[in-house]
Amino acid sequence: MYQLKIEGQAPGTCGSGKSLLVSALANGIGFPYECASGGCGVCKFELLEGNVQSMWPDAPGLSSRDREKGNRHLACQCVALSDLRIKVAVQDKYVPTIPISRMEAEVVEVRALTHDLLSVRLRTDGPANFLPGQFCLVEAEQLPGVVRAYSMANLKNPEGIWEFYIKRVPTGRFSPWLFENRKEGARLFLTGPMGTSFFRPGTGRKSLCIGGGAGLSYAAAIARASMRETDKPVKLFYGSRTPRDAVRWIDIDIDEDKLEVVQAVTEDTDSLWQGPTGFIHQVVDAALLETLPEYEIYLAGPPPMVDATVRMLLGKGVPRDQIHFDAFF
């Protein structure tokens, strides 16, 4: 264990082998972060004293200018090699609501939702305790150093069930391995829960859930929580590339009687497709127009989709604090 000193904060500790981000959050420190995967750069810090090892030296969250300075690092992608003194602007909103822990989990069910999207259910010994819309870092012993962030699609439960909708990324390392080794009884490790874009039940507004690709997991969790905890109408918009990528809602066990679902594709390659065609932010805009500020809005998906949707929402007058999002890098 190494000591972690952040200017203006009480000292904490860095666990051996844990990322600096996970260690800081486990100490109750409001360390800023977003994707926890090396892509967004929100967890960047300045190293004042000590040594760290980068788990992903080429992570896109660091700019070339950051690398030239030599003392800028991503907390989600480095581990401590000594006592550390760092500089970062901590914020209370990042202090974990639920304590973060590392858990061993068993794969209990794997189902194909589409040709490249799996529903994977894991079970831990203790209860599955998390907020709707949060995510976990997932690891496999067979892939040392490979850590991926996936949102839970289900809700907290005493049975210890954690469900994820995982999309195959052909150029990735974790998802292709999982698709090829998708067998019940396999062991994985979860670290979490993490994420600050969770469901807010007390706003009094209707919920609008928007997902693209693997963002379905996040959008489904928010929709499930909203239907359970409020009596307000819930809308879910989901965008795919082609009709082949579209999901059947019966396969993900979501109650369409209480939920208005709109599924769109960007490439209409099937003459039988009857849904809207276009980018999902355009479909949402056309469907809801000037009523968008009436909603509490939750969205997740690839960064270009999230960026385009946020710009559209702000342009429609939606207050920034009514928009909650996760971008999957």
From Swiss-Prot:
Q: Cross-referenced SUPFAM superfamilies, in alphabetical order?
A: 2Fe-2S ferredoxin-like (SSF54292), Ferredoxin reductase-like, C-terminal NADP-linked domain (SSF52343), Riboflavin synthase domain-like (SSF63380)
Cofactor binding, per record: Binds 1 [2Fe-2S] cluster per subunit.
| 2Fe-2S ferredoxin-type domain boundaries | 2-92
An example Pfam family from this entry, by short name, is: Fer2
Keyword Cell inner membrane among record annotations: no
Residues annotated for [2Fe-2S] cluster binding in this entry: 35, 40, 43, 76
Q: Which InterPro entries match?
A: 2Fe-2S_ferredoxin-like_sf, 2Fe-2S_ferredoxin-type, 2Fe2S_fd_BS, Beta-grasp_dom_sf, Cbr1-like_FAD-bd_dom, FAD-bd_FR_type, FNR_nucleotide-bd, MRET
List keywords of the entry alphabetically.
2Fe-2S, Dioxygenase, Iron, Iron-sulfur, Metal-binding, NAD, NADP, Oxidoreductase, Plasmid
Reactions catalysed, semicolon-separated, are: 2 reduced [2Fe-2S]-[ferredoxin] + NAD(+) + H(+) = 2 oxidized [2Fe-2S]-[ferredoxin] + NADH; 2 reduced [2Fe-2S]-[ferredoxin] + NADP(+) + H(+) = 2 oxidized [2Fe-2S]-[ferredoxin] + NADPH
Instruction: Spell out the activity-pH relationship.
Output: Optimum pH is between 7 and 7.5.
Quaternary structure (record): Monomer. Carbazole 1,9a-dioxygenase complex consists of a terminal oxygenase component CarAa, a ferredoxin reductase component CarAd and a ferredoxin component CarAc.
Q: What does this protein do?
A: Part of the multicomponent carbazole 1,9a-dioxygenase (CARDO), that converts carbazole (CAR) into 2-aminobiphenyl-2,3-diol. It can use both NAD and NADP as electron donors, but NAD is supposed to be the physiological electron donor.
Record's protein name: Ferredoxin--NAD(P)(+) reductase CarAd
What is the native source organism of this protein? Answer: Metapseudomonas resinovorans (Pseudomonas resinovorans)
Q: What is the lineage of its organism?
A: Bacteria, Pseudomonadati, Pseudomonadota, Gammaproteobacteria, Pseudomonadales
